[in-house]
Amino acid sequence: HQIVVESMWGMSFDKPVRHMREYLEVMMPLLEGKPVSHAGEAFNVNGGVNVPGGTRPNVVIAALGEQMLKVTAALADGTLTWCTGPQTLANHTVPTLKAAADKAGRDATRVIAALPVCVTNDREAALQRAAQVFVVYGQLPSYRAMLDKEGAAGPADIAIIGSASEVADRIMALAEIGVTDFAAVEFGATPDEVAETRALVKSLLK
């Protein structure tokens, strides 16, 4: 997010896709124990990291837009999304990542979808709670773009809210569109709702 990169980190947000590509070009070989000699626009690196017995961890990028998804497919292992609804995952995220991974000859198709989740008998109260808790995300351009693709006014519109069976069905349906992992961001208007939501999510763990 531009406001984070510039205002909090004091870095340039001028070319975020180029910056991420170069970052991964440096980091991925280092994680594999290979030496790196890199002179670029954002980084100048000469060196290596040696961790005896270590193996490279999976690297996932919070890639949402088309160009960042393509960089992710070419160099990393997958993406972690937020404020991205099921239609956008099905029609944008998953196919864009898969096509770019196929083109690069890589299996970088991991999609971790994070969404707000609440098991409740009072849908309207939960929607109001979601609108309050997650309002800031609808104001950040990257998330706003994903909400617009979904036709959602705000994060509450893509929250998974309902009875235990309804929530379970909606979470499981994500696997059918190519989501490989689900990250539940639990919330509730009451302590009981939070507890019921946690119990439901735990019951779905595989």
Specify the residue positions occupied by each region the protein language model found:
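Active-site-adjacent structural elements that line small-molecule/cofactor binding pockets in enzymes
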Residues: 1-206
